[in-house]
Every structure is written in C-alpha cells, then in structure tokens.
Amino acid sequence: RNYIVENVSQSGEVPATGYVPSGVYDAEGANGDDFRTVGGEYYSVSADDYQANCDKARELLAEAGYPNGEGFPAVEYMYNTDDRHKAIAEALQNMWQTELGVTVNLSNQDWNVFLKSRKDGDFQIARNGWIADYNDPCSFLDMWYTGGGNNDAQYSNPEYDALIDAAKATSDQTE
C-alpha cells in the first residue's frame, strides 16, 4: 500500500489501514478523536511488515494447496476506464504475480458497465475509489452490511450486522 501511494498514485494519499480511513470522526463526532486513532489499525502498512505480510500470504496459499501459487486459478481484477485505476491495477497485478505466483488478468470497463457489473456481483475483484457520504464510520462500515446499498461484494454476516445495529443504537462509546 505504501508503494502504491508513493510510487503509483503519488497524490499524497494515506495508505489504508482499515475499512474506515483516517479523518473520520469517532463516536463523539467533531468533538472527539479520529476513528482510526481510537479504533487502531487493522492492517500494518509499514515497509518493515511488507515482507512478513507476503510470507504469510504465501503460507496461507500453501496451506490451501497452492504452494507458490501453483494451480491457483487465474484471478480477474476489474477496474473502470481511468488511467489512475489502470496504474494501480497493473501494480497489484505485478505484486501478486511476483510475490505470490498468482496470475491476475486485468479487465477494464467503461464507467456505466463497471457500475452494473459491480451491482450485479459480476466480478471477482473490483477496484473502487469512494469517499464517505457523511463523516461517520458507518458510512464505510455499511459497505459490508447485508443488503446495504453500497455492498457490491454482496457480503453477508449476521454477527457483523448485529454489531453494526448495536453500534447505531447506542451513544455510549464504551459499548
């Protein structure tokens, strides 16, 4: 992620360390802290951890029966027609193929076709860039809520949904 923001997009982005990015308020709103500061980082983007993350990914592939990516089916990475999205797709394709031995086929689509493919769930991996509709963690966390309007991945987990429902129903930050 550091490589992408420093060498590919080069627009001053902060590498993502979780589903909710930096700059989003915590439960106390504008008077509180940054959600990422309070909630901590889900994923380390430090350069020191990059190799360890690659090693862990290779280990998991081997455990699943795909040592060095051998026999792993090709993955399709879909993105909309945009030079920035293309550059990121090509960087990820190179990383996954080099580090994991996983073949990644790139597929670009015009914006309206891309939106329909995502909404229909007709993709394996789809690149998306998005900013929150409002400054609240749920603007991002709702992307994984069953039946949510932005849940293009069609993810569904009753436990996750219950946690989101509980978070929305309380103003007690300790809960």
Residue ranges and their predicted role:
Residues 1, 5, 9, 58, ...:
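Non-transmembrane alpha-helical segments in soluble domains
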Residues 1-3, 11-15, 24-27, 81-85, ...:
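Solvent-exposed loop/turn segments at secondary-structure junctions
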Residues 5-6, 45-51, 102-114, 119, ...:
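Extracytoplasmic/peripheral linker and loop segments enriched in polar/acidic and small residues
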Residues 5-10, 18-19, 88-91, 137-140:
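Short, solvent-exposed loop/turn and secondary-structure capping segments
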Residues 8-11, 18-23, 71-75:
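Short coil/turn segments at secondary-structure boundaries
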Residues 14-63, 82-86:
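Structural transition elements
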Residues 16-17, 21-24, 32, 131, ...:
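Generic secondary-structure boundary/loop-capping signal
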Residues 47-54, 58-132, 173-174:
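Ligand/substrate-recognition segments at binding pockets and active sites
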